[in-house]
A protein has these predicted regions:
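Amphipathic alpha-helical polymerization modules
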Residues: 1-225
C-alpha cells in the first residue's frame, strides 16, 4: 500500500499545483510550479520547485508598469518582512509611495520610494526619477548566486534555505511593460485531464488492494477458527 499511497499523494499534489498554475495563467510576473518525485535513501520524496523561466514581455504604455529582464526580482516590504516579486503592475499608495498591486511598498537603495503626484521615469538600470530629478534606484536582486525561492503568494517569493539573493548586476528594466505569466494554460488543461485519469486509476488500485486485504484477513480468521 505504501507505493499506491505515495502515488495518490503525488497525483493530488499535481492536481493542486496545476490548478494553481491555471488560475494564475494571466497573472503578470507569475512563475509556475512543477511537481517532482524521486527516491531518497530508498524512500519516495515528493515536492515542488519553481519554474523561473521568463514569461513573454508586452508593452502597456503605463508608466507604473515595470518588467524585468533576466532573473532579477523587485524587493517589496510587507508586514511579514521583505519579499521578492516580478509582478510589475505597480501603483502609488495613499501616502505617495511606490507600491505593488497588494499595497506593499517597493524598495530602492534608500528605502521606500516616494513619488507623490509627480511623474515617474525609470531607466533601464532601475534609476527612478520624479519630475526629472533622480530620487532613488530600484533594489533588484537576483538568484544568479544559486539562491532558491519559495512561493509566498501569487507573485511573491521568500529565499529558500540555501542562500540569500544578491544584487542584480545585469539589471534590465523596461518601464511601460509587463512580464506575462510563464504558466501554459493549454498545456495545463491537457495535464489536468491526464492527472484526473491517473488519480482515478490509483484510487481504484487502492480500493482493489483494500478488498484483497479484507478477503485475506477474513480467510485467515476462518482458518484460525
Amino acid at each position: 500500500m505504501t507505493g499506491a499511497a505515495s502515488a495518490l499523494r503525488y497525483w493530488e499534489l499535481r492536481q493542486e499545483v496545476t490548478a494553481n498554475n491555471l488560475a494564475n495563467a494571466s497573472t503578470d510576473g507569475f512563475k509556475a510550479e512543477r511537481v517532482f518525485a524521486r527516491l531518497l535513501n530508498g524512500a519516495p520524496v515528493i515536492g515542488t520547485h519553481t519554474d523561473r523561466r521568463e514569461g513573454a514581455v508586452h508593452q502597456t504604455g503605463q508608466p507604473l508598469d515595470i518588467a524585468l529582464g533576466g532573473d532579477g526580482f523587485l524587493v517589496v516590504n510587507t508586514p511579514a518582512g521583505e519579499r521578492y516579486t516580478r509582478g510589475g503592475a505597480l501603483q502609488i499608495d495613499t501616502e505617495g509611495f511606490l507600491a505593488d498591486r497588494d499595497g506593499n511598498r517597493v524598495l530602492g537603495a534608500k528605502g521606500a520610494i516616494q513619488v507623490g503626484a509627480g511623474t515617474l521615469v525609470v531607466d533601464r538600470t532601475g534609476n527612478a526619477a520624479v519630475d526629472g530629478k533622480t530620487v532613488d534606484r530600484l533594489r533588484i536582486e537576483s538568484t544568479a548566486g544559486g539562491a532558491t525561492l519559495d512561493h509566498a503568494g501569487a507573485t511573491a517569493f521568500v529565499p529558500g534555505a540555501t542562500r540569500t539573493l544578491v544584487a542584480d548586476d545585469k539589471r534590465d528594466v523596461q518601464q511601460g511593460h509587463l512580464e506575462d505569466s510563464n504558466a501554459d494554460s493549454l498545456g495545463g488543461l491537457v495535464d489536468m485531464i491526464s492527472i484526473q485519469r491517473a488519480y482515478a486509476a490509483v484510487e481504484k488500485t487502492i480500493s482493489v488492494l483494500d478488498h484483497v486485504r479484507e478477503v485475506a484477513t477474513s480467510q485467515l480468521g476462518k482458518g484460525a477458527s
